[in-house]
Each structure stands twice: as structure tokens, then as C-alpha cells.
A protein has these predicted regions:
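Core catalytic alpha/beta fold that binds nucleotide/phospho-ligands
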Residues: 1-208
Length: 208
């Protein structure tokens, strides 16, 4: 598995935007421009550029994204030999690529929040473990990004309740499917996890 990530905390210059934008097929360009906020447009653009750069490492041509298809749950895919997933939060965009099976990735900036708003998304055991943790905020975001990475790997959208995902150490399970979990260290203010439906023998991170 390869994880590509980039940091973006300001508007891209017009020239840089145009260079990246022109690398993408018209359909993806249209998707990007539907976003109202510049932050969302940038995150969408950079996610696709990370994907494109990553796919090139696997031997795909520069115009390969024109062949993107979408599952019934609107999850993009290219072919059966490769899987990928993109996530963004705050100032980071991440993209995981896997040529051995399914993959999901999630990153979240660890902002202070009211835990009670998420009580219904956590089991009693998870809730108690969080309150017993020396760093409740970190535990919450670890749990959240693990579950989100599994959901994204499953590729069935919001049809999988967070309560149905059971995380234990380096694995998580949902609907009799076992997922292997790996924590990605990108920034101390963020939580990021990758999930794969097979044992993760190798994982490489690349800053772009």
C-alpha cells in the first residue's frame, strides 16, 4: 500500500491551479468546480492529483483518470487490479493506493468537540474506554478514523452504521469482513488510519 499526502494551507497560484487542472479529464474538472468553497475545490483537485501521481507509479498512463467508473454507491474505481481512496481534513489531503485488495483511508484534524453529540455512534465499551483514556480527544479521533477508513474501504457509503464496526488493535470487523488497520503519522494535530481487507505487509508514505 502506498499513501500519498500533501499539505495545503493557502490558495494555489493561478498558474499552479491551471497546470494541475489541465491534467484532469473534463468530467472531473466539472465535479471540482461544483464546490462553492475554495478549500473544497483545492482539496478535490489535490486529491485527484495525488491519485494521478500515485497511479503513475503503478504504470498507469497520464490520462488514466478518463477511464474512472463508479460503483452503485458512487465509489470511483479504475479496474480490478488496483484500489484507491482519498480523504482530506484541515490542511492535508491523503490518497491510499493498493494493488493487493481493497483500501480505505481517513484523516481528521483533532479539534475540540462535545463528545456527548457522538454518544449514539459509540458502543458502551467504546464510550467507557474513551473516558478512561488519558487523552480522550485522541482516543475519539483514533476510533473515528479507524471506523471511517473501514466504511470507505467497504465502499457502501453511509449504509454501514458506525456501531456495527468493532475495532480491536490492528484489526476491525464489520458484517463478517475482517479489516487490517494501520495508523499513519502525518501531523501530531491529526489522526489518520488506513484499512485493508488483507494483512498489510508493506506500507509506504510519500509527501508530495
Amino acid at each position: 500500500i502506498d499513501v500519498f499526502y500533501t499539505h495545503c494551507d493557502a490558495l494555489l497560484t493561478t498558474d499552479t491551479w491551471d497546470i494541475y487542472f489541465q491534467k484532469l479529464p473534463q468530467g472531473i474538472q466539472t465535479q471540482i468546480m461544483r464546490f462553492k468553497r475554495w478549500q473544497d475545490r483545492h482539496a478535490s483537485l489535490l486529491g485527484k492529483i495525488l491519485l494521478l501521481e500515485g497511479l503513475k507509479k503503478y504504470g498507469y498512463p497520464p490520462d488514466c483518470l478518463k477511464n474512472l467508473s463508479y460503483s452503485p454507491y458512487n465509489r470511483p474505481f479504475l479496474d480490478d487490479s488496483i484500489d484507491f481512496n482519498i480523504s482530506h481534513s484541515g490542511e492535508y489531503v491523503v490518497c491510499a493506493i493498493n494493488n493487493e485488495g481493497r483500501v480505505g483511508i481517513d484523516i481528521e484534524r483533532m479539534r475540540p468537540l462535545d463528545f456527548s453529540e457522538f454518544r449514539n455512534y459509540m458502543t458502551s465499551e467504546e464510550w467507557n474506554m474513551m473516558h478512561e483514556s488519558p487523552d480522550q480527544l485522541e482516543y475519539f479521533y483514533e476510533l473515528w478514523t479507524v471506523k471511517e477508513s473501514v466504511i470507505k474501504g467497504e465502499g457502501k457509503g453511509l449504509s454501514i452504521p458506525l456501531l456495527d464496526i468493532h475495532w480491536e488493535g490492528e484489526t476491525a470487523s464489520v458484517s463478517n469482513n475482517l479489516w487490517y488497520i494501520r495508523k499513519i503519522l502525518i501531523d501530531p494535530g491529526y489522526s489518520c488510519h488506513v484499512a485493508a481487507n488483507h494483512e498489510i505487509s508493506e506500507l509506504h508514505t510519500h509527501k508530495v
